[in-house]
Amino acid sequence: MKKIITIALALIVSISMVFASSVFDDFKADLVANESKGFAESLEGYKPSNPQSMGMGGAGLAINDSLDSLFSNPSILGQGKVRFSIPSATVTVNHVYDLVKKGEDGKSALDKIQTAIKEGAADNISDLVPIVSSLIGTGKSKIASVEASVGMLANVFGLAMNVNDTVRSFDGTVFDDLKISAVMGLGFGIGNDDVRLNVGFTGKINVNAFSKRISVNDAMNFNEETINQLPFAIGYGIPFDAGVSLKFHSLKATATLTDINILGLGDYKYDMILVEDVTTKLNSIDAISGEATKIRENSVYQFTPKMKLNAGIAFDTESSTGIKLAFDVVDILSIPDALDAGYSTKGVLLGHTKSGAEFSLFNFLKVRGGLNSGYFTLGGSVNLGFITIDAAYFWEELGVVAGEKGLDGLSLRFNIGWDN
């Protein structure tokens, strides 16, 4: 009897391993086939989603000195300021326009969802699948995200941590994208309040975990068993960023070099794991450390992001009732590749430019507007002393050139912090 039990257990383990291996092979094949189309943002490290910048068309590299910008502009470490964020939380919902716009039948997706719920879709969630599938469309897109961050600046030293979870879609399927990023850096500044040069350098540990793509129907009928058998790719990279900024009275200019890969540390190496194995494999700090070592040594998939050069200029009156104007050019190094690929010069250049303005009406109220790759954005913030609330309705370009794949979103952030 003991032998029979042993053989049975061995068969069960073998079958489960074969099943998991098959699932992982399919997942890896999907990554290879759609690396640049559907998974590029998931494979790369965390990029800050700052409603202040979103409301200004994605611009503000030279003037945005919030703790969020520590993830994208290390030169803020040369300002010599002290700042705490404990914490900030951001919620973003996409496809807002698609949700409320009227179709050929005179009804919006929101109208159809409300009607379906009244007719019993709450009991049969599958009735909502066609509506949701039509809403997210084809190609790559995002549905919603939540994130939280904490951080501090202490003169020339800064550190921050961010957790972001985004539900993405690609060709009618959906998948979860979780990112955890910790950044630490040093900077220095030369000059005074009117004329100043700031330089900063940061290192980041970016941990990415994203699931295999599943159908909308499966996503809307999730249960514990389905979740436990869902495979995730999990990996991390350690990229470095450098930034320099120059201030001359009200004029400011900033340049950053991000995703610098030193000694291969910036390569993202991935292993694959089932959800049900997470609690058993990652149940302690030692276990996490051991798994992290295994991922780097025995990775099944590797992604190397390209280094990015960004530049921004701005005009900032630095007064409580003043105005800020900003213009950025992002990912400059990829522009020649896009032009060589045959894309139009106008579309490529417009797709890499961001511009915006911020008007401070009072000490506590700001209004923003801008153009993000040609799409109009707007936003604002209210400072209540103990908490700052930022909101933005924005459009962003998910394609290579302006006008290829626009996506809108509504973002709201609450920040409890102290600034000096």
Identify the role of each PLM range.
Residues 21-53, 134-420:
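Outer-membrane beta-barrel porins/channels
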Residues 2-10:
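Sec-dependent signal peptide recognition
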Residues 64-67, 74-190, 199:
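N-terminal functional module of multi-domain proteins
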Residues 21-69, 75, 84-109:
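Short glycine/proline- and aromatic-enriched beta-strand/turn motifs that initiate or cap beta-hairpins
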Residues 3, 59-61, 65-66, 245-246, ...:
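Short hydrophobic/aromatic segments of transmembrane alpha-helices and their interfaces
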Residues 15-20:
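Sec/Tat signal peptide C-region and signal peptidase I cleavage site
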